[in-house]
């Protein structure tokens, strides 16, 4: 029987984000900049990662507390060996209605069919430019945008439902909004533009680099005829619009200018096995991995997860100002540990 629990701000728990690795084959400046994550950077050893059995056990307990959706993140999750094994395990859990995965897309041709066969049906591909030269400068690994576009075509050809995520930075890739919207509109693929966020400690974020949803919308309305779309469910993070001529939708994610803390229903498990109640959390999350490996029962695990959720009061984006960003004393967990 599913228990209905809420946090201190009255928010239910509906989603679980599982980071399966801290490794990535890109070095995007806003997430894993090359000067920080260089050749000598020490990533987590295998024994510091949760096993697939541990993840499935955690997901099963969370399902009993109301979680219906699971998203697999990283790092780059396709770098975790035998990920299809985890997908298959998660698909067997009662109450889990949706499993998604966020990826940079580079390894979709290599692993996509196995993941589909294991039950994965929905992926988000991160692609911050459609121009090859610009995209190479963003990922810092000489990967062309056309390479990822080919991977996306492959993913759709095998039956995966693909959405594309684009982090927009002022003066870097804001000129990509219109060409990317045009390209994916013609492909009938949903694209979502995300305001640049201050996740982690190494991405050089400040307010001047943010292109707000209103600015994006003004730009888009000069080129396309669109209508707003009503939210589909409580906690939906994107504001959706529909092209009038062919009905294809796109989204704008207002993570800075119009926060959605009040409807956030996500629990997050980092690649090193810690619980966090917020994408912008500090680095002292509850160590679920150590707790599980101490020999606790499922009932003890459930009680711990209940307690963690019921004391949750995170609302970082509601409280974000230039001063709070500058004065934040405690380091936030980096993106490669907690996913997007």
From Swiss-Prot:
It is an enzyme of class 4 (lyase). It catalyses: GTP + AH2 + S-adenosyl-L-methionine = (8S)-3',8-cyclo-7,8-dihydroguanosine 5'-triphosphate + 5'-deoxyadenosine + L-methionine + A + H(+). Its cofactor is [4Fe-4S] cluster. GO terms for biological process: Mo-molybdopterin cofactor biosynthetic process. It comes from the Bacteria. [4Fe-4S] cluster 1 binds at residues 24, 28, 31. Binds 2 [4Fe-4S] clusters. Binds 1 [4Fe-4S] cluster coordinated with 3 cysteines and an exchangeable S-adenosyl-L-methionine and 1 [4Fe-4S] cluster coordinated with 3 cysteines and the GTP-derived substrate. Its EC number is 4.1.99.22. Pathway: Cofactor biosynthesis; molybdopterin biosynthesis. GTP binds at residues 17, 71, 102, 163, 266-268. The keyword Metal-binding applies. Monomer and homodimer. This is GTP 3',8-cyclase. The lineage of its organism: Bacteria, Bacillati, Bacillota, Bacilli, Bacillales.
